[in-house]
Amino acid sequence: MSKIIAWDIETCPLDTNTFTSRQDRRHSLLVNAELDKNPSTSYEDASRKACSLHPMLGFICCISVAVEDEASLMRAEVHSFVADDPETERQLLIDFRDFVGQFRGMDTWVTFNGKRFDLDWLLHRCLHHGVQAPGNVRMMNRNPYQNQYHADLACVLKSPAGLADLCDHLGIESPKQAMDGSGVAQAVAEGRLDDVAKYCEADVLATLECYLIVKRFAAAAFA
Protein backbone atom coordinates (compact mmCIF):
# COMPACT_ATOMS: atom_id res chain seq x y z
CA MET A 1 0.00 0.00 0.00
CA SER A 2 1.37 3.43 -0.95
CA LYS A 3 2.22 5.99 1.70
CA ILE A 4 1.77 9.71 2.12
CA ILE A 5 4.97 11.12 3.62
CA ALA A 6 5.00 14.70 4.90
CA TRP A 7 8.24 16.20 6.14
CA ASP A 8 9.67 19.49 7.33
CA ILE A 9 12.95 20.91 8.63
CA GLU A 10 13.99 23.46 11.25
CA THR A 11 17.21 25.43 10.94
CA CYS A 12 19.66 27.30 13.17
CA PRO A 13 22.41 29.85 12.55
CA LEU A 14 26.04 28.76 12.54
CA ASP A 15 28.43 30.50 14.93
CA THR A 16 29.55 33.63 13.06
CA ASN A 17 32.96 33.32 14.73
CA THR A 18 33.60 30.24 12.59
CA PHE A 19 32.82 31.97 9.27
CA THR A 20 35.27 32.08 6.41
CA SER A 21 35.85 35.42 4.71
CA ARG A 22 33.37 34.47 2.00
CA GLN A 23 30.73 33.54 4.58
CA ASP A 24 31.40 36.86 6.33
CA ARG A 25 30.72 38.78 3.12
CA ARG A 26 27.53 36.85 2.45
CA HIS A 27 26.41 37.34 6.04
CA SER A 28 27.02 41.10 5.93
CA LEU A 29 25.07 41.50 2.70
CA LEU A 30 22.08 39.55 4.01
CA VAL A 31 22.05 41.26 7.41
CA ASN A 32 22.27 44.73 5.86
CA ALA A 33 19.44 43.88 3.48
CA GLU A 34 17.30 42.73 6.41
CA LEU A 35 18.07 45.90 8.39
CA ASP A 36 17.22 48.06 5.37
CA LYS A 37 13.91 46.26 5.04
CA ASN A 38 13.13 46.31 8.79
CA PRO A 39 15.04 49.20 10.43
CA SER A 40 13.57 48.48 13.86
CA THR A 41 15.11 44.98 13.91
CA SER A 42 18.19 44.50 16.08
CA TYR A 43 21.44 43.40 14.47
CA GLU A 44 21.32 40.13 16.44
CA ASP A 45 17.81 39.31 15.22
CA ALA A 46 18.71 40.23 11.65
CA SER A 47 21.79 38.01 11.83
CA ARG A 48 19.83 35.11 13.30
CA LYS A 49 17.20 35.38 10.56
CA ALA A 50 19.74 35.68 7.76
CA CYS A 51 21.69 32.65 8.93
CA SER A 52 18.59 30.56 9.57
CA LEU A 53 17.41 31.14 6.00
CA HIS A 54 20.66 30.41 4.15
CA PRO A 55 22.12 26.86 4.03
CA MET A 56 25.70 28.15 3.87
CA LEU A 57 25.24 30.15 7.07
CA GLY A 58 23.17 27.74 9.13
CA PHE A 59 22.56 24.08 9.92
CA ILE A 60 19.56 21.77 10.14
CA CYS A 61 18.61 21.15 13.76
CA CYS A 62 15.49 19.03 13.20
CA ILE A 63 13.74 17.02 10.50
CA SER A 64 10.32 15.55 11.24
CA VAL A 65 8.46 13.03 9.09
CA ALA A 66 4.80 11.97 9.22
CA VAL A 67 3.90 8.73 7.44
CA GLU A 68 0.34 7.66 6.67
CA ASP A 69 -1.20 4.88 4.58
CA GLU A 70 -3.38 6.37 1.86
CA ALA A 71 -6.34 4.20 2.84
CA SER A 72 -5.77 4.38 6.60
CA LEU A 73 -8.05 6.11 9.08
CA MET A 74 -5.39 5.95 11.79
CA ARG A 75 -3.26 8.90 12.89
CA ALA A 76 0.04 9.21 11.04
CA GLU A 77 3.26 7.87 12.54
CA VAL A 78 5.68 10.71 13.31
CA HIS A 79 9.48 10.46 13.53
CA SER A 80 11.99 13.21 14.33
CA PHE A 81 15.74 13.57 13.94
CA VAL A 82 17.52 16.32 15.90
CA ALA A 83 20.95 17.96 16.11
CA ASP A 84 22.22 20.60 18.53
CA ASP A 85 25.27 21.69 16.50
CA PRO A 86 26.85 21.29 13.03
CA GLU A 87 28.78 18.20 14.14
CA THR A 88 25.69 16.22 15.18
CA GLU A 89 23.88 17.50 12.07
CA ARG A 90 25.89 15.02 10.01
CA GLN A 91 24.35 12.06 11.87
CA LEU A 92 20.91 13.64 11.59
CA LEU A 93 21.30 13.71 7.81
CA ILE A 94 22.44 10.08 7.71
CA ASP A 95 19.61 8.90 9.96
CA PHE A 96 17.00 10.80 7.94
CA ARG A 97 18.38 9.48 4.65
CA ASP A 98 18.35 5.90 5.92
CA PHE A 99 14.82 6.27 7.27
CA VAL A 100 13.30 7.65 4.07
CA GLY A 101 15.27 5.12 2.03
CA GLN A 102 12.70 2.47 2.95
CA PHE A 103 10.05 4.23 0.84
CA ARG A 104 10.66 3.34 -2.79
CA GLY A 105 7.17 2.61 -4.13
CA MET A 106 4.36 4.77 -5.47
CA ASP A 107 4.46 7.03 -2.43
CA THR A 108 3.49 10.71 -2.33
CA TRP A 109 5.84 13.18 -0.66
CA VAL A 110 4.28 16.29 0.86
CA THR A 111 5.87 19.57 1.97
CA PHE A 112 5.01 23.23 2.37
CA ASN A 113 7.60 25.25 0.43
CA GLY A 114 9.81 22.16 0.41
CA LYS A 115 10.90 22.50 -3.21
CA ARG A 116 12.36 25.96 -2.63
CA PHE A 117 13.51 25.69 0.99
CA ASP A 118 13.70 22.23 2.60
CA LEU A 119 15.22 20.38 -0.35
CA ASP A 120 17.70 23.18 -0.99
CA TRP A 121 18.87 23.02 2.62
CA LEU A 122 18.97 19.23 2.58
CA LEU A 123 21.17 19.13 -0.52
CA HIS A 124 23.52 21.88 0.64
CA ARG A 125 24.01 20.39 4.10
CA CYS A 126 24.55 16.87 2.73
CA LEU A 127 27.18 18.25 0.34
CA HIS A 128 28.89 20.17 3.14
CA HIS A 129 29.22 17.02 5.26
CA GLY A 130 29.99 14.66 2.38
CA VAL A 131 26.82 12.68 3.08
CA GLN A 132 24.98 10.88 0.27
CA ALA A 133 21.64 12.65 -0.20
CA PRO A 134 18.38 10.65 -0.31
CA GLY A 135 18.06 8.90 -3.65
CA ASN A 136 14.27 8.82 -3.99
CA VAL A 137 13.49 10.71 -7.21
CA ARG A 138 9.93 11.42 -6.13
CA MET A 139 10.98 13.04 -2.89
CA MET A 140 13.80 15.00 -4.55
CA ASN A 141 11.64 16.36 -7.41
CA ARG A 142 11.93 20.16 -7.27
CA ASN A 143 9.93 20.98 -10.40
CA PRO A 144 7.29 23.49 -9.17
CA TYR A 145 4.86 22.36 -11.89
CA GLN A 146 4.99 18.64 -11.08
CA ASN A 147 3.10 17.96 -7.88
CA GLN A 148 1.86 14.43 -8.40
CA TYR A 149 4.78 12.74 -6.64
CA HIS A 150 6.14 15.58 -4.50
CA ALA A 151 3.17 17.73 -3.55
CA ASP A 152 4.54 21.07 -2.38
CA LEU A 153 1.42 22.88 -1.19
CA ALA A 154 3.08 26.26 -1.70
CA CYS A 155 3.47 25.37 -5.40
CA VAL A 156 0.06 23.76 -5.76
CA LEU A 157 -1.85 26.74 -4.37
CA LYS A 158 0.63 29.43 -5.45
CA SER A 159 -0.61 31.88 -2.83
CA PRO A 160 1.71 34.29 -0.97
CA ALA A 161 0.84 32.83 2.41
CA GLY A 162 2.47 30.64 5.02
CA LEU A 163 1.44 27.33 6.52
CA ALA A 164 -0.31 29.04 9.44
CA ASP A 165 -2.35 31.09 6.94
CA LEU A 166 -3.38 27.97 5.04
CA CYS A 167 -4.36 26.23 8.28
CA ASP A 168 -6.52 29.23 9.21
CA HIS A 169 -8.06 29.23 5.73
CA LEU A 170 -8.96 25.53 5.97
CA GLY A 171 -10.10 25.58 9.60
CA ILE A 172 -7.14 23.56 10.89
CA GLU A 173 -5.48 24.28 14.22
CA SER A 174 -2.30 26.27 13.63
CA PRO A 175 1.00 24.61 14.57
CA LYS A 176 2.45 28.07 15.35
CA GLN A 177 1.37 28.34 18.98
CA ALA A 178 3.89 27.52 21.73
CA MET A 179 6.70 28.23 19.24
CA ASP A 180 7.28 29.49 15.73
CA GLY A 181 10.32 29.50 13.50
CA SER A 182 11.82 32.59 15.13
CA GLY A 183 12.11 30.76 18.45
CA VAL A 184 13.92 27.66 17.19
CA ALA A 185 17.49 28.98 17.49
CA GLN A 186 16.95 30.09 21.09
CA ALA A 187 15.39 26.74 21.99
CA VAL A 188 18.36 24.87 20.53
CA ALA A 189 20.80 27.16 22.37
CA GLU A 190 18.97 26.33 25.61
CA GLY A 191 19.09 22.59 24.92
CA ARG A 192 15.32 22.31 24.38
CA LEU A 193 15.54 19.94 21.42
CA ASP A 194 12.36 18.15 22.51
CA ASP A 195 10.44 21.42 22.14
CA VAL A 196 11.91 21.95 18.67
CA ALA A 197 10.93 18.41 17.67
CA LYS A 198 7.38 18.90 18.96
CA TYR A 199 7.08 22.12 16.98
CA CYS A 200 8.44 20.51 13.81
CA GLU A 201 6.12 17.52 14.27
CA ALA A 202 3.15 19.87 14.61
CA ASP A 203 4.19 21.45 11.30
CA VAL A 204 4.32 18.14 9.43
CA LEU A 205 0.99 16.97 10.84
CA ALA A 206 -0.62 20.27 9.84
CA THR A 207 0.96 20.01 6.39
CA LEU A 208 -0.39 16.48 6.02
CA GLU A 209 -3.87 17.54 7.12
CA CYS A 210 -3.86 20.45 4.67
CA TYR A 211 -2.76 18.13 1.88
CA LEU A 212 -5.57 15.65 2.58
CA ILE A 213 -8.17 18.44 2.41
CA VAL A 214 -6.78 19.96 -0.77
CA LYS A 215 -6.46 16.50 -2.36
CA ARG A 216 -10.07 15.71 -1.45
CA PHE A 217 -11.58 18.84 -2.98
CA ALA A 218 -9.04 19.72 -5.68
CA ALA A 219 -7.44 16.44 -6.74
CA ALA A 220 -6.82 17.69 -10.29
CA ALA A 221 -4.33 20.24 -8.93
CA PHE A 222 -1.91 17.38 -8.27
CA ALA A 223 -2.08 15.88 -11.77
Where are these regions (language model features)?
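Metal-dependent phosphoesterase core characteristic of DEDDh/y 3'-5' exonuclease domains
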Residues: 2, 58-86, 104-223
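Conserved non-catalytic scaffold segment of RNase H-like nuclease domains
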Residues: 2-124
